[in-house]
Amino acid sequence: MGTGFARGARGTAASGPGGGFLFAWILVSFTCHLASTQGAPEDVDVLQRLGLSWTKAGGGRSPTPPGVIPFPSGFIFTQRAKLQAPTANVLPTTLGRELALVLSLCSHRVNHAFLFAIRSRKHKLQLGLQFLPGRTIIHLGPRQSVAFDLDVHDGRWHHLALELRGRTVTMVTACGQHRVPVPLPSRRDSMLDPQGSFLLGKVNPRAVQFEGALCQFSIHPVAQVAHNYCAHLRERCRQVDTYSPQVGTLFPWDSGPAFALHPEPALLGLGNLTRTPATLGARPVSRALAVTLAPAMPTKPLRTVHPDVSEHSSSQTPLSPAKQSARKTPSPSSSASLANSTRVYRPAAAQPRQITTTSPTKRSPTKPSVSPLSVTPMKSPHATQKTGVPSFTKPVPPTQKPAPFTSYLAPSKASSPTVRPVQKTFMTPRPPVPSPQPLRPTTGLSKKFTNPTVAKSKSKTTSWASKPVLARSSVPKTLQQTVLSQSPVSYLGSQTLAPALPPLGVGNPRTMPPTRDSALTPAGSKKFTGRETSKKTRQKSSPRKPEPLSPGKSARDASPRDLTTKPSRPSTPALVLAPAYLLSSSPQPTSSSFPFFHLLGPTPFPMLMGPPGSKGDCGLPGPPGLPGLPGSPGARGPRGPPGPYGNPGPPGPPGAKGQKGDPGLSPGQAHDGAKGNMGLPGLSGNPGPLGRKGHKGHPGAAGHPGEQGQPGPEGSPGAKGYPGRQGFPGPVGDPGPKGSRGYIGLPGLFGLPGSDGERGLPGVPGKRGEMGRPGFPGDFGERGPPGLDGNPGEIGLPGPPGVLGLIGDTGALGPVGYPGPKGMKGLMGGVGEPGLKGDKGEQGVPGVSGDPGFQGDKGSHGLPGLPGGRGKPGPLGKAGDKGSLGFPGPPGPEGFPGDIGPPGDNGPEGMKGKPGARGLPGPPGQLGPEGDEGPMGPPGVPGLEGQPGRKGFPGRPGLDGSKGEPGDPGRPGPVGEQGLMGFIGLVGEPGIVGEKGDRGVMGPPGAPGPKGSMGHPGTPGGIGNPGEPGPWGPPGSRGLPGMRGAKGHRGPRGPDGPAGEQGSKGLKGRVGPRGRPGQPGQQGAAGERGHSGAKGFLGIPGPSGPPGAKGLPGEPGSQGPQGPVGPPGEMGPKGPPGAVGEPGLPGDSGMKGDLGPLGPPGEQGLIGQRGEPGLEGDHGPVGPDGLKGDRGDPGPDGEHGEKGQEGLKGEDGSPGPPGITGVPGREGKPGKQGEKGQRGAKGAKGHQGYLGEMGIPGEPGPPGTPGPKGSRGTLGPTGAPGRMGAQGEPGLAGYNGHKGITGPLGPPGPKGEKGDQGEDGKTEGPPGPPGDRGPVGDRGDRGEPGDPGYPGQEGVQGLRGEPGQQGQPGHPGPRGRPGPKGSKGEEGPKGKPGKAGPSGRRGTQGLQGLPGPRGVVGRQGPEGTAGSDGIPGRDGRPGYQGDQGNDGDPGPVGPAGRRGNPGVAGLPGAQGPPGFKGESGLPGQLGPPGKRGTEGGTGLPGNQGEPGSKGQPGDSGEMGFPGVAGLFGPKGPPGDIGFKGIQGPRGPPGLMGKEGIIGPPGMLGPSGLPGPKGDRGSRGDLGLQGPRGPPGPRGRPGPPGPPWHPIQFQQDDLGAAFQTWMDAQGAVRSEGYSYPDQLALDQGGEIFKTLHYLSNLIQSIKTPLGTKENPARVCRDLMDCEQRMADGTYWVDPNLGCSSDTIEVSCNFTQGGQTCLKPITASKAEFAVSRVQMNFLHLLSSEGTQHITIHCLNMTVWQEGPGRSSARQAVRFRAWNGQVFEAGGQFRPEVSMDGCKVHDGRWHQTLFTFRTQDPQQLPIVSVDNLPPVSSGKQYRLEVGPACFL
């Protein structure tokens, strides 16, 4: 670039002053034309396409969109920004698949926002860039993305490029030095939907907005641009991170008329480096501003040849390289800042021509870049430079030496010219206005001026000695169309205008070859040194000797005088193309004789250029030019001393939550301090820039309140602070902006199950209806065409939570486990082997929001949500006028203590505030030291009624006194001191029904009870699960031939056969003759056990055969396989007493026994330790008045004092030592049970007591009365099967069942026996319709009533349930008789009770006495009679404490005193009688299964209870003994065809073949298992065949039937039915039945009707609908049958039994057909699924998943890690099969989030995920080892559904 200008200068010398400039401007115009016509039209400036042009950013007329704040380096996007446009308006349709994205941005807020997103017309993401904390993700499609480890949320500017080429995405940083390529797994979609939408700053209109500054966002169709993207960065973008931006530069400002009229240095850019460049780039249209052309400075003085002013050549002596680096420091007179920078204007619309400038800058790690419209993509070896926004530059390390200028045009280090349009404005020269003081060196140049660039040296050589610091410039467009006349600029032109001209001979600036001009570096030229200037030049240039700095001398070594106070040395003053008001309107300046610019109109041939001419001679130096404008701002100087503290900035956004602080040390209970006065509101500080951290300065005085500053970047998490006090609630804030769409939440809590309805009364059995007329089977209807697509529905509410993601890839091979026990033979596995559990993957990229799901069912109310996070601060509003001082606002919430600031001045003392509200009671303080004993005060007023104290210690025996008269009742005395622990009292009377208490914990298993009497036979149990096959037994002896078996069960539904082709209709064959009976065959050898055959169709029951002859006793057969576990057998006979078992676990307290005889006095016990005082209980109810006691001895009269004021309650003194335990007194009569007190605090753990010896078993007590009905207990664990009991008595007849709905017509029954002779008809009846009845006979017997239930066996004794909740208080029982009087000792006379005396002072603490010797056991006295109650006596005066007297008669219950102080914990009392029935409590948590108790005896038969509701299916019992063969039952109807079951044991015989010859009687088979109770039998068998009656009268002909249509049946499905019908027809004919033709036709129609029904049934079995009537086995069956099923609720029946036990599940088809079971309630791990159904579901599944979330408050529920013994404190999860998931165990859950370890007074949650390949582990049935709950520590359980696949 400099080369071109040098040639222009030579042209000036050769052809005159004007010809050179004409030639130069022709080059400029031609270059601009090439740049405009041969540029890169496909480069896309996204900001400009979105309407954010630079003219707008610089203060143009068009307003910026809301939420976008322009500033000199680009645009700031706030939360309110919404930029969206059609994709076709932003990106050209010709954009290929190879792209390069060049970005320059700075993030202000950490979030997950997208910088941009391109979505298709269907709202699918096609391309997007997302910034996560620590990562940068580029999305190439809905499910294709690439992540890079680049964090842009660090508050710094980032320049980067992304290359999208083929199957590779490359991120390029550091100007191409750092590249990270990432291959794509699949080919990305290259076509972008032009009808889609382009969003800037977010991924969708509801998403979170990118908040930050964006300088450049360009898209290039050439992917290689990314590797040299710095060459395509705009100048202002390369400078943004070089300077510290100030707040003032971030907002547009107007360069008003003051700037135009007063060209002061401060206004021209020298005083404020941040405002001037913004002005220069802000309004090129209205101001016609040009940009300073700073001088190029060679590093040595060059000799110049000038006829007039050669002696002044030393004034142009440039600086040495060291001084050039020194010019980077700020100086008032330095102009190097703009000399090293170039103003870059935003391209205006439709600018046809451009000016090319270059910018050589200093070397730094970040390489510079140029505008996207660059002409020559060359690298620059220099650092990023300031372009006009910032005020300071980054210091360049002094070790980076500048390269020689000869490398400037080298291919690898050449600078890149920037093409930018300027305003097409004509400028007229005007005389310059003299500039004030800092620019005096510039004014001197108007007289003496030489050209230092092209000079003749004595050696006839011209050279650039070192790397010059060229200036970048921007020339107004006016200069493109003008020819510069001869002016002083022509002598500067070779230096200052060199950057504006391209090299000669360059056709396309984009492909400019690296040329080297001889004017710059001629071959063999001598390099000038820094001392080759003439002495004459030096002497006349300045009185001072030049002091160039050495190359090794840095800017910091240069003195300030060298940098700031040498007017003749810094550089050649910059002659500027000034604004229009500085240029003259005539060719000659009006204030001097020097020519200036002569601006002509457009040249006639601007685009014509001849071949490059030969190199011209150096021209003569021109006259000195006009004084230049003020120089450009100087470079940044050395770091100054640290300034004073700035005013505090505005409060920043809330930082990340700090860790929990250490608990504070509490020296004791702190008294509440007085409420301080409300302080005056503080002044707001000036918004300070985000500067580098300076040295700690002295505290400055408080500044004036400043305007609200820009929100600073989000700070890093602060140091761990102390928790602040709870502040007053602040005023209600304005509603914040609408937040981004949140992630799909967890499923809500499941609702509680509804209460069971009342059992209805059994209905009256209905009358049997008349036989309906059978209809003819209809044709199969063809499947209807699919319906039209419905109109799209409205957007529904947010659907249920999304399903889990796809199953991940197979994980790495895990460690080889220990060999497990040999398992039973498993079922046929599913497709494919499940892979091993993979390692936990990294957190995936947040997926794109899915389509709206189906509307889910309304969930129950969930737990209260956690408080939401604080919203983002809104955009900064315009600063308003300073308002008047407002009233003090309410105090805001107190924040965390900040850093200790400098002490401020003491403010004026404020007014005393009003007393604050009484604070919450503080924590109890530590007990202070005991104070000195104060003087005795005056006797106080009698205190309030005290609470009755505990029983005192017995006193010494007193003398016998005379019995006094009854005294007056005295007032209640003061509250006595807390007594010591009393003795165990007798069992009290039943109290009144208490309030509903909390559910108690599960008690220990009780001791085995006495064997009860035999109970009534129970209801028949359910069908048990098949047991594991047992070992083969020895061959048994051959049994006798068995009797005919009972009716079999309904067979399971067989598999569907393949559909056969429709056969042709065959001719009806004649009935063949009956064959002769064959010879009986020989008995074959017993074959081997065959494999299990496929399950065949259920055959229609054949006719009953005649009973066979009694067979011979058979040989013992081989032991067969162990059959399935049968129902529990009946109770066996009582066995002999077993051996004495081991001592059992301690049982619950037994019932109250009878009063035993008085035992001998026990030994004196040791004094127990005093327990911790319990919490203060509530006041009990006032009891009835007690008996008046005997008058006590009169106490000493106290002095009557005046009534004193009520004193304050003194502090509790320390408890005194317990005194010597006295003789146990007689127990008083227990009072009524008080109200339930509040729950006390958890007491300290007591010492482990010694295991007592087992007592003698007591006599069984009398049978108690039936207790009240207890609350429903939780489902206990399955007990072990009981022994086979003896056969019970026949059960009672059951209720008559309700009449069921009319079932479908069953298949034809078996052939009935011939009926009795019918009676002759008397009258001829009307012709009946064709019926479906059997052979004509008498009416059969009335059907038998329902079979009585099988006698059930006595169930296994269940575990003791958890204690029920405390019942309501019962009514007081009748007063008991006085107990027998105990042995009476020496009774002292009782004194009269005296009046209450004054409370004495508390005595000093006495020494603890030694335990007394053991007393002599006294004789037992005779039992006295109970005395009658005495009359109440009067209260006497208080007497002295008497010695221990004998126990008096039990008095009546006295009035309940006031609530006393909590006493020490007493010993546990005896168990009281059972209370009344309490309210049903909430179901408690499932307790651990207790140990199995010993077998109890048979209890007495109880009264027949009410029929209970249907219970859960019981566990399978052991196989019972074969029962006695029952009577022949009625034949039942054939059952429905069931689904294909799992492969079972050897199947039953197949379909019944044709009737064969009766063979010999076979061996007696093994007795089958007793079957379950069958359905009510159909019509009974016909009776014995009666005598044949005469034929009846012929009936009338029936109505004509419908036309015959051949029915199309599937051969395989209906073959068995046809065969059966044919067999039946053959049997009818063979036995000689003569049916009329009409009857045969009716039978055929009935059979076809049955077949039609069976066909429909088979079709429904093939395609289940998932309804309650037609359930599927699992959800996967529904997905296999119907490929397009919606997720939702369906019904399944895993065991394919009766439809009454179907399960309602949630099917997740998007996850492969998961079957999800919901818990009964989300707060408990309970599932309303029977164990039988669950076992089948486990067999049908191969894996399971379940989530459990624990919401906790200040509670840790999971701790796991090496070396932590605290893992024992973590929660444990019990699986369905009994295994335990726990920390550190064999099975551990996945903890994806553990927020409960944070204890900050807020709710957190810990999420546990259970994924297992063993489905029998799920669902989780209990959560154990949860920490105890207190007022400050709570938890909530949220159990998710268990999903099986």
Curated annotation (Swiss-Prot):
Q: Which residues form the Collagen-like domain?
A: 610-664, 673-732, 742-801, 817-876, 877-936, 937-996, 997-1038, 1039-1096, 1117-1176, 1177-1236, 1240-1299, 1325-1384, 1424-1483, 1484-1543, 1544-1603
Where is there biased composition of kind Polar residues?
312-323, 444-454
Q: Looking at the record, which segments are called Disordered? A: 299-478, 502-572, 608-774, 827-1608
Molecular function per GO: extracellular matrix structural constituent; metal ion binding
- Has UniProt tagged this entry with the keyword Protein biosynthesis? no
Disulphide bridges, residue numbers: 1675-1707, 1716-1843, 1752-1796
> What positions does the entry give for Ca(2+) binding?
1693, 1695, 1698, 1701
Q: Where is the composition biased (Basic and acidic residues)?
A: 554-564, 1187-1212, 1226-1238, 1311-1323, 1335-1345
* Bias type Pro residues, positions: 429-439, 639-654, 1588-1605
Report domain Fibrillar collagen NC1 positions. 1645-1845
Region described as Triple-helical: 610-1603
Q: Which residues form the propeptide?
A: 40-609, 1607-1845
Q: Which Pfam families match?
A: COLFI, Collagen
Q: Which residue windows does the record flag with biased composition (Gly residues)?
A: 865-874, 1018-1027
Q: What is known about the tissue distribution of this protein?
A: Highly expressed in cartilage, eye and ear.
Give UniProt keywords alphabetically: Calcium, Collagen, Disulfide bond, Extracellular matrix, Glycoprotein, Metal-binding, Repeat, Secreted, Signal
Database matches in PROSITE patterns: NC1_FIB
GO biological-process terms attached to the record = extracellular matrix organization; growth plate cartilage chondrocyte development
Q: What family is this?
A: Belongs to the fibrillar collagen family.
Domain free text: The C-terminal propeptide, also known as COLFI domain, have crucial roles in tissue growth and repair by controlling both the intracellular assembly of procollagen molecules and the extracellular assembly of collagen fibrils. It binds a calcium ion which is essential for its function.
PANTHER family xrefs: COLLAGEN ALPHA-1(XXIII) CHAIN-LIKE ISOFORM X2, SI:CH211-266K2.1
Q: What is this protein called?
A: Collagen alpha-1(XXVII) chain
Species in which this protein is naturally found = Mus musculus (Mouse)
Q: What is the lineage of its organism?
A: Eukaryota, Metazoa, Chordata, Craniata, Vertebrata
